[in-house]
């Protein structure tokens, strides 16, 4: 993963952790957890692509990697919808900027994971 993406993830996670949404703070914590999970998944998929010969061991280790990939895309779609919803309802400019950047990052990561997965197929 390039350093800009790493710092973007870290920056967004830090800013999201500072937000308070009252009764929906559990939802925000869930989003943060999914962001972190997505970052780790993207990193591991990228490393597998960089080793290219790792496809065979990836398939042996986890015969359900396509199912996991599908699940990650569902998580990304859910996060995108959740971020869009938060963006629509918030009036705080700090939160708007954070969610706009989170949305952009999610779209970039979705594309990167698609690229990695096509290289692994």
From Swiss-Prot:
InterPro entries: Flu_NS2 (IPR000968). Gene3D superfamilies: 1.10.287.230, S15/NS1, RNA-binding (1.10.287.10). Its main location: virion. GO terms for biological process: exit of virus from host cell nucleus through nuclear pore. A motif (Nuclear export signal) lies at residues 12-21, 85-94. It is found in: Virion; Host nucleus. One of its GO terms (cellular component) is host cell nucleus. Keywords: Host nucleus, Host-virus interaction, Transport, Virion. HAMAP family: INFV_NEP. Interacts with protein M1. May interact with host nucleoporin RAB/HRB and exportin XPO1/CRM1. Mediates the nuclear export of encapsidated genomic RNAs (ribonucleoproteins, RNPs). Acts as an adapter between viral RNPs complexes and the nuclear export machinery of the cell. Possesses no intrinsic RNA-binding activity, but includes a C-terminal M1-binding domain. This domain is believed to allow recognition of RNPs bound to the protein M1. Belongs to the influenza viruses NEP family. Average number present in a viral particle is estimated to be 130-200 molecules. This is Nuclear export protein. It comes from Influenza A virus (strain A/Duck/Hong Kong/2986.1/2000 H5N1 genotype C).
């Amino acid at each position: 993963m390039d350093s800009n993406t790493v710092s973007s993830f870290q920056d967004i996670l830090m800013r999201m952790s500072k937000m308070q949404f009252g009764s929906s703070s559990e939802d925000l914590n869930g989003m943060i957890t999914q962001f972190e999970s997505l970052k780790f998944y993207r990193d591991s998929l990228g490393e597998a692509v960089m080793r290219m010969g790792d496809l065979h061991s990836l398939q042996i280790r986890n015969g359900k990697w396509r199912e996991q990939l599908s699940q990650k895309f569902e998580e990304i779609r859910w996060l995108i919808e959740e971020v869009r919803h938060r963006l629509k309802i918030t009036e705080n400019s700090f939160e708007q900027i954070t969610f706009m950047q989170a949305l952009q990052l999610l779209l970039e990561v979705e594309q990167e994971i698609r690229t990695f997965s096509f290289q692994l197929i």
